[in-house]
Curated annotation (Swiss-Prot):
Family: Belongs to the nepoviruses RNA2 polyprotein family.
Entry-linked InterPro entries: Nepo_coat, Nepo_coat_C, Nepo_coat_N, Viral_coat
Name by which UniProt lists this protein: RNA2 polyprotein
GO molecular function: structural molecule activity
Natural source organism: Raspberry ringspot virus (strain S) (RpRSV)
Keywords carried by this UniProt record: Capsid protein, Host cell junction, Host cytoplasm, Host nucleus, Transport, Viral movement protein, Virion
Comment field (misc): Virions are comprised of 60 copies of the coat protein.
Comp. bias regions, Polar residues: 572-581
Length: 1107
């Protein structure tokens, strides 16, 4: 050993001795000297003797968590100090002080330099245990490469060593550590303890430098015996280290080191952290966080030993192996406008609930996610061009661009990839079940495949492991953090890169959320009124405040805590009309959970009677809210009269009673354009009202419904107080499913309408709900309610089949009903995607059963056919997506009778079970919540020519004097009895005008005709006149033309649809632009045909057409 190292320079040895004396003095000054190193008693005798002789430390036992923390952290201090300290800082100090030096990191014989630099020199010349008996020093390279170096001003100075020779010096230092790792580790650990008690801060970084060289030696020394050949031993150690999956942590090493004689292997010792190759990307605690001073942990331990409380420890750093291995398989494709999308969602798991509760119980209230280390392993062949975007997503936000915190795109052609992500998200951390659930499930990982290159669904594409670094804090007041001061500091220690998302080879690109985005511009702030303080009830006898009878110790575990505490009031907020799930806890089920209704928001109320033996299809009430509110004369009505137009958002509250035995299903709809005849009293079904804004509820589990209606969205306009202008405020309440068991007596429903007049008015009189032309994504607007359907108690009816043809009309008895979403869908020949749906059980709770949902290309599929294909087993009110079974790859929209059509089948599995005397059937409703993944749907018309639509035809003309008008709105033309017949044509474009409330725009008319006699005998003319404005006394004329009976071209003229306010509707009285057609020789005309072409058109409000 001495032959290799030579001797230390005299100045260096003296400096180290002075340092040793200074350290001993600092120890004696320390008030908490007794618990400084409780691990001492566990060391071997030689190490104890060395430390006691060198530092005069007392003997004592015990294990302090802070000391174990330091032992574990020493391993993580890898190449940081060796590269940054030995090259950068020491070299900079030498240049600044003009100190003669040997190489980049070795100083000696430098009189006049500061104590900090002396400490540097002393530590970097760290001696072995034999330093007292034999002077040794690093090998001074005196020959060959050093001969031409410039000589220093002192005799002992060997001059400057070129920067490239640092490796030779590091080899010498490595040799020292490899042979004497145990005493050097103990030495630097002891040095690190005294940072707070007088030792220079630079000394800690020197200690970390040596610590970076120790873990591999510790991992191998107790497994391999030295052979005497230094190079052979070093290669053996390296081979052993390379064969291990990961580097042991300090804690695992000590456990194994002291139990090596027992022959037991420490289980799961490799799970402490990922193996870290210094040449690749990787996180360590030291990269992200400052070290917690060991003295702080020792002081905390000593305070606990004395029974005192120390409130200074407000920050805790955790490092969790969130996912050791997760395999991502290619998911099903979702159809989008940009093509198929393959995306897999994975929750980033946290610690167990029990571990989280224990931390919460001791006071940790906030969890800051500071960094996530993701390692990706590809499972496809090298060179296959498949890419995947892996995103860290905030699951509380439904908007993907907003929710994405950072993301990176991986080229799976490279087998191993790694990315460091700094998401910056703080989560509440408490004993509340909601907070624990949010902490464990909020952060998600999304794997989005661009193009799977023909790989089958379900193929394992990649595996990934994740390592998360978090920081726990006790209060929001805590501003202290162990996180590095800036991103640049983190980047230096993490991977010498840049940005919040840093990646290794194989990463194509990365995305990062802006840390300080500009704030959006909002409307002027409207301050709400100050809430009135709540009064406590005082016991008249004792004078004490009466406590709530819901004790704090009561355990309340419920599915959705937000349902309990965020109960919406009439003043604002939006409540889903879907009934709550079985596991949820509604406000009315909690004692004392009352809410206040502001009477100043009440527009009108009415009590609706329900017969005790009510039947399905019965209309209970038709409420003209505008007319009834005028009679009721509420405060809101007076505001309405004063302002003229109603505010856009209204709330309809329906309060009934829960009846779990009756099986009644009630509904309400908003018929703004009176498409349901006023004489209708019975026969109201879901097929009739599903195209109107509506809500449905079953009395078995719902007693109150709050329905928020946005008039701007469903109508595109508001309503005038003193007259019906654009439409009508008609609300219908009806029965969709009658009694299974007759009620004891007639009962009633309380219906009220509320308007918050502090809300903003509509920005314009008319806001279009649909703009021509239709787009492929508009087919996803399909939202309907079907049913009720049933399974009989005797099992004779155990299956219900539903054809999914979104472009066809709905059958309603002997009538057909056309709705706005279905007419829009009819503009496309086919569609692709999935159906979002749910099933709502509505029968008496005495009847129970289970069912599955399957798909088929025909309605004859039985249970054996369903279970062999993809199918779903669902519960009531759960929303799920159905991927249809289609042999052609596309689903027909409005035809398919010859080649088949897709069906959704609901088949009974178990049940139906009920008491002996049960009556009725097991009933359910089907809710369609829209279509997803719709893309590239071919239209009915070719894209390279104008779109013309047939409107009507006039024939059988019996009078030579023909006069008829074409109005400036698309509607059915009525024949003139005894003069001519009219045929109105049906097509998706003309139907679009009939299923919307108002329309306004420009159309181009194409008018053609033909004679009914031979060409030589035909005579006469046909002419038109455009009336821009017309009254009995005044006319504004537009274009005009006269043509002969024999004419091949006909007329083409543009005409505006809309009254003076910019829109019109079918059958609306008033003056609109029109076109007059005249002929004095009309009997010579066989027929006149009129088609139209939409140039531009806005549609307002969706409704239905019943024929």
């Amino acid at each position: 050993m001495s032959q290799f190292w030579g001797e230390f320079p005299e100045k260096v040895i003296q400096t180290f001795q002075h340092l040793q004396v200074a350290l001993i003095g600092d120890i004696k000054k320390c008030a908490l000297s007794s618990p400084l190193f409780p691990e001492l008693s566990k060391l071997d005798a030689h190490s104890q003797h060395h430390l006691l002789a060198s530092f005069e430390l007392p003997r004592f036992g015990g294990v302090t968590p802070g000391v174990m923390e330091q032992l574990r952290d020493a391993e993580s201090e890898l190449a940081e100090a060796k590269q940054r300290l030995l090259r950068e800082r020491l070299h900079a100090v030498a240049n600044r002080q003009n100190i003669p030096y040997l190489g980049d990191c070795m100083y000696y014989d430098a009189p006049g330099i500061s104590q900090e630099e002396l400490l540097q020199a002393a530590f970097l010349e760290a001696p072995t245990p034999a330093w007292e008996h034999e002077r040794i020093r690093p090998l001074w390279p005196k020959d060959e490469w050093f001969r031409d170096a410039r000589q220093g001003p002192y005799l002992e100075d060997y001059g400057n060593i070129p920067l490239g020779d640092l490796d030779t010096l590091c080899l010498a230092f490595d040799a020292l550590v490899e042979e004497h790792w145990m005493p050097i580790y103990l030495l630097i650990s002891t040095f690190s303890m005294f940072q707070q008690y007088g030792t220079q801060p630079l000394l800690l970084e020197c200690a970390q430098s040596a610590g970076s060289l120790i873990p591999a030696c510790m991992m191998t020394d107790h497994h391999l015996e030295p052979t005497g050949d230094r190079q052979a031993d070093k290669e053996a150690r390296q081979d052993y280290a390379d064969s291990q999956d990961s580097i042991q942590s300090m804690g695992d090493f000590w456990k194994e080191f002291y139990t090596k004689d027992s022959g037991k292997k420490i289980p799961d010792s490799h799970k402490s952290r990922l193996a870290n190759d210094p040449n690749k990307v990787g996180f360590t605690k030291s990269a992200l966080f400052h070290k917690q001073p060991l003295s702080h942990s020792l002081a905390q331990t000593w305070a606990n030993f004395r029974g005192t409380q120390d409130k200074a420890d407000l920050v805790k750093v955790t490092m969790d192996m969130n996912i050791e291995k997760y395999t991502v398989r290619l998911p099903d494709a979702v159809r989008t406008t940009a093509g198929p999308l393959y995306i897999e969602w994975i929750n980033l798991p946290r610690m167990s609930e029990n571990s989280a509760r224990k931390l919460a119980e001791v006071g940790w209230n906030n969890a800051d996610i500071c960094g996530v280390d993701l390692a990706v392993k590809s499972h496809i062949a090298v060179g296959t061009p498949v890419r995947v975007i892996i995103s860290l997503v905030d699951g509380a936000c439904s908007d993907m661009p907003t929710a994405t915190m950072c993301a990176f795109e991986v080229n799976l052609a490279s087998q191993n990839n790694r990315s460091l992500n700094l998401p910056l998200l703080s989560l509440p951390f408490s004993r509340l079940l909601a907070d624990l659930h949010d902490f464990q499930n909020r952060v998600k990982i999304a794997c989005q495949f661009r193009d799977p290159e023909g790989f089958n669904v379900g193929t394992p594409m990649l595996s990934f492991s994740s390592l998360e670094f978090s920081e726990l804090k006790q209060t929001a007041f805590e501003r202290n953090s162990l996180l590095r001061d800036s991103w640049s500091e983190i980047e230096k220690r993490a991977c010498h890169g840049g940005g919040r998302c840093v990646a290794s080879q194989g990463i194509v690109q990365t995305w990062e959320k802006e840390v300080n985005p500009p704030l959006k511009e909002y409307a002027p702030l409207v301050l709400p009124p100050v809430p009135q303080p709540k009064r406590n009830f005082i016991d008249q006898q004792t004078g004490e405040v009466v406590q709530s009878f819901m004790q704090k110790s009561r355990s309340m575990r419920f599915k959705s805590p937000s349902d309990l505490w965020s109960r919406p009031s009439v003043d604002g907020g939006s409540t889903s009309t879907q009934p709550p799930s079985k596991g949820s806890l509604r406000c009315e089920n909690v004692p004392g959970c009352a809410y206040e209704v502001d009477p100043l928001h009440l527009l009108y109320y009415e009590s609706v009677d329900v017969p005790k033996d009510t039947l399905a299809g019965t209309l209970l009430a038709r409420i003209d809210v505008r007319a009834k509110a005028a009679i009721f004369d509420s405060a809101v009505w007076r505001q309405w009269v004063r302002d003229g137009c109603l505010k856009p958002k209204i709330k309809m509250r329906i309060t009934a009673a829960t009846s779990c035995f009756s099986g009644i299903v009630l509904g309400a709809c908003f018929d703004a354009y009176r498409r349901i005849p006023a004489a209708t009293k019975t026969g109201i079904t879901a097929s009739l009202v599903t195209g109107l804004p509506n809500t449905v509820w079953a009395t078995r589990d719902t007693s109150e419904v709050e329905w928020d209606i946005d008039l701007a969205a469903v109508c595109g306009h508001t309503f005038f107080a003193l007259e019906d202008t654009f439409g009508y405020m008609d609300f219908l309440i009806y029965v969709l499913r009658g009694n299974e068991i007759t009620a004891v007596a007639d009962w009633s429903i309380y219906v009220s309408f509320h308007v918050d007049w502090t809300q903003e008015s509509m920005l314009a009189t008319l806001i279009p709900t649909f703009v021509w032309p239709p787009k492929p994504t508009d087919i996803s607007l399909l939202k309907e309610v079907w049913g009720p359907y049933r399974f009989t108690l005797d099992g004779t009816e155990a299956k219900e089949s539903f054809a999914i043809m979104p472009g066809t009309a709905i059958l309603h008895g002997q009538q057909i009903v056309r709705t706005f979403p279905r007419v829009v869908a009819a503009h496309f020949r086919s569609w692709t995607g999935k159906v979002r749906m749910s099933i709502q059980e509505v029968s008496s709770i005495f009847l129970t059963g289970t069912y599955m949902v399957g798909v088929s290309w025909n309605a004859t599929a039985d249970l054996a056919d369903i279970v062999t294909r993809k199918h779903w087993i669902v519960k009531s009110n759960e929303i799920f997506e159905v991927d249809l079974y289609c042999p052609y790859g596309e689903n027909p929209t409005f035809t398919g009778q010859a080649n088949g059509k897709p069906f959704i089948i609901v088949h009974k599995l178990g049940g139906i079970v009920g008491p002996k005397d049960s009556v009725g059937t097991f009933g359910f409703m089907i809710h369609i919540h829209g279509l997803t993944g719709v893309y590239k749907n071919p239209t009915l018309h070719s894209g390279d020519r104008s779109v013309g639509s047939a409107w009507f035809r006039i024939n059988n003309i019996a009078d030579d004097n023909l006069v008829f008008n074409i109005p400036g709105r698309i509607e059915d033309i009525i024949a003139a009895a005894g003069k001519y017949d009219v045929t109105n044509y049906v097509n998706p474009t003309s139907l679009l005008f009939s299923v919307t409330g108002l329309h306004g725009g420009i159309i181009r008319l194409h008018i053609t005709w033909c004679p009914n006699t031979t060409l030589g005998e035909s005579k006469g003319t046909l002419k038109y006149m455009q009336y821009l404005y017309h009254t009995a006394t005044e006319n504004f004329f537009g274009d005009q033309a006269t043509r002969g009976i024999i004419d091949q071209d006909g007329f083409t003229i543009d005409i505006a649809c809309g009254d003076f306010f910019g829109a019109t509707r079918v059958g609306l009285p008033g003056e609109v632009e029109r076109l007059g057609i005249y002929s004095s020789n009309a009997k010579s005309i066989a027929e006149i045909r009129v088609s139209f072409e939409v140039l531009s058109m806005n549609f307002y409000g969706s409704t239905i057409k019943v024929t």
